[in-house]
């Protein structure tokens, strides 16, 4: 039995770790969720994700409602007030309950003397809400993105940037991948309906199912038995270009948490797959996914820039490089990305991607296929990256994804309900 813990104080502490300490929410949130009951885990997640999704609005509101920002040891109270404002603005929690629980959060973070301040700020917002929101609707922060990212999106996508921003600010749908070795997609959809859940198919990806309403994995028919995996439709699109076949030696580079590794083995169960990632901790999730789906791959920790260290001189029939990137295509899934990324990161990531591409190309057999993929929507990491690689690599040929002038296939966030994703299929010419 979990003891009664103030959820609002936990949310405030998590958000503070992200905004002030640069921690990823995916690292900060799970340990906090272990402290609360199962029924409260979803609310804690909603509060954290919601505040980070709307952070620039909440910051602006606090600047209007308070004469001075909270600093030093009182900084957590600043984020607790944000949690309160988010509940009043965006949730169905009755306002009196939202206020009471948020004010009580001050006790949990050992700032009981500030209960009156928190209560006063939130009640002041209730009184002034209509006027404040009307003013905010004209403010530059209304797009809920940092200025540097907004500028990049406007430059890269002058016609679509507003749609991208709108998609980034939505709650993401829950996509699943049906394991074709257990059931066809339509067979599994029938099982889903029997379980009282509704799903929709994707026009391009044959194994994809989108739930009408997100559900816990234990509610999904056969999840524990490996019948289905949680994976966005756009990530499933990698197989459309990789096209793995039985008997081939295939490298999945930057493989954690293993969604694409297991997809390769569902499409080509007799393929010999090596899954490599630099992050040893995240590799544990690759092992977990392989075990749940009952498939085997050779899993190694290694740096993509130095393949000789983990595969010697071996060459592969196909390589999937899901390159480290800005993750600007999955902001709706990870709203902390907006506040963790910096403008300078983009050039550094593009340099890293180029180094990995250069290093791994020598490990592709002549006639082999390399699929370069990112969950970014920035040209520096995508079309420009591949154009530069083609220009310096005489035996590389673009195939079925874009044109040499504008190489690759770019999916924008929200299109067909999928994440933002980029793919380029490269063939190594035979001499």
From Swiss-Prot:
Gene that produces this protein: rsmB
PROSITE patterns: NOL1_NOP2_SUN (PS01153), SAM_MT_RSMB_NOP (PS51686)
Keyword field: Cytoplasm, Methyltransferase, RNA-binding, rRNA processing, S-adenosyl-L-methionine, Transferase
Binding positions (S-adenosyl-L-methionine): 254-260, 277, 303, 322
Name recorded for this polypeptide: Ribosomal RNA small subunit methyltransferase B
One GO-annotated biological process of the protein: regulation of DNA-templated transcription
Organism: Klebsiella pneumoniae subsp. pneumoniae (strain ATCC 700721 / MGH 78578)
GO CC annotations, alphabetized: cytosol
Pfam families documented for this protein: Methyltr_RsmB-F, NusB, RsmF-B_ferredox
Entry-linked NCBIfam families: PRK10901.1, PRK14902.1, rsmB
Family: Belongs to the class I-like SAM-binding methyltransferase superfamily. RsmB/NOP family.
Function: Specifically methylates the cytosine at position 967 (m5C967) of 16S rRNA.
EC class (word): transferase
GO molecular function annotation: RNA binding; rRNA (cytosine-C5-)-methyltransferase activity
Compartments where found: Cytoplasm
E.C. designation(s): 2.1.1.176
List of catalytic residues: 375
Catalyzed chemical reaction(s): cytidine(967) in 16S rRNA + S-adenosyl-L-methionine = 5-methylcytidine(967) in 16S rRNA + S-adenosyl-L-homocysteine + H(+)
InterPro entries per record: MeTrfase_RsmB-F_NOP2_cat (IPR049560), MeTrfase_RsmB-F_NOP2_dom (IPR001678), NusB-like_sf (IPR035926), NusB_RsmB_TIM44 (IPR006027), RCMT (IPR023267), rRNA_ssu_MeTfrase_B (IPR004573), rRNA_ssu_MeTfrase_B_ent (IPR023541), RsmB-like_ferredoxin (IPR054728)
């Amino acid at each position: 039995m979990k003891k009664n813990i103030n959820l609002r104080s936990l949310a405030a502490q998590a958000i503070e770790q992200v905004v002030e300490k640069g921690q990823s929410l995916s690292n900060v949130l799970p340990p906090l969720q272990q402290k609360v009951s199962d029924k409260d885990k979803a609310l804690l997640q909603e509060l954290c994700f919601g505040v980070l999704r709307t952070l620039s609005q909440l910051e602006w509101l606090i600047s209007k409602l308070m004469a001075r920002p909270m600093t030093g040891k009182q900084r957590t109270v600043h984020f607790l007030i944000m949690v309160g404002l988010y509940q009043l603005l965006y949730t169905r929690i009755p306002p009196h309950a939202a206020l009471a629980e948020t004010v009580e959060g001050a006790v949990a973070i050992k700032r009981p003397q500030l209960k009156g301040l928190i209560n006063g700020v939130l009640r002041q917002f209730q009184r002034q809400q209509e006027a404040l929101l009307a003013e905010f609707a004209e403010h530059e922060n209304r797009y809920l993105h940092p200025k540097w990212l907004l500028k990049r999106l406007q430059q890269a996508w002058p016609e679509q940037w507003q749609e991208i921003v709108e998609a980034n600010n939505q709650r993401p749908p829950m996509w699943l991948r049906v394991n074709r070795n257990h059931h066809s997609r339509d067979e599994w959809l029938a099982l889903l309906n029997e379980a009282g859940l509704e799903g929709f198919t994707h026009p391009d990806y044959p194994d994809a199912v989108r739930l009408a309403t997100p559900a816990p994995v234990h509610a999904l028919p056969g999840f524990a038995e490996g019948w289905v995996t949680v994976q966005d439709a756009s990530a499933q699109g990698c197989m459309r270009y990789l096209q793995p076949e039985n008997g081939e030696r295939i490298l999945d580079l930057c493989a954690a948490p293993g969604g694409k590794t297991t997809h390769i083995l569902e499409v080509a169960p007799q393929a010999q797959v090596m899954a490599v990632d630099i992050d040893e901790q995240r590799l544990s999730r690759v092992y977990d996914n392989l075990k749940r789906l009952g498939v085997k791959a050779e899993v190694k920790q290694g740096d993509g820039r130095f393949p000789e260290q983990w595969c010697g001189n071996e060459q592969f029939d196909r390589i999937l490089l899901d390159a480290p990137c800005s993750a600007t295509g999955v902001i709706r899934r990870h709203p902390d990305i907006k506040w963790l990324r910096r403008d300078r990161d983009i050039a550094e990531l593009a340099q890293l991607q180029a180094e990995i591409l250069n290093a791994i190309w020598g490990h592709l057999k002549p006639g082999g296929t390399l699929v370069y993929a990112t969950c970014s929507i920035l040209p520096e990491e995508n079309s420009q990256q591949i154009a530069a690689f083609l220009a310096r690599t005489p035996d590389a040929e673009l195939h079925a994804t874009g044109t040499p002038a504008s190489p690759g296939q770019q999916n924008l966030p929200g299109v067909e309900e999928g994440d933002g994703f980029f793919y380029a299929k490269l063939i190594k010419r035979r001499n």
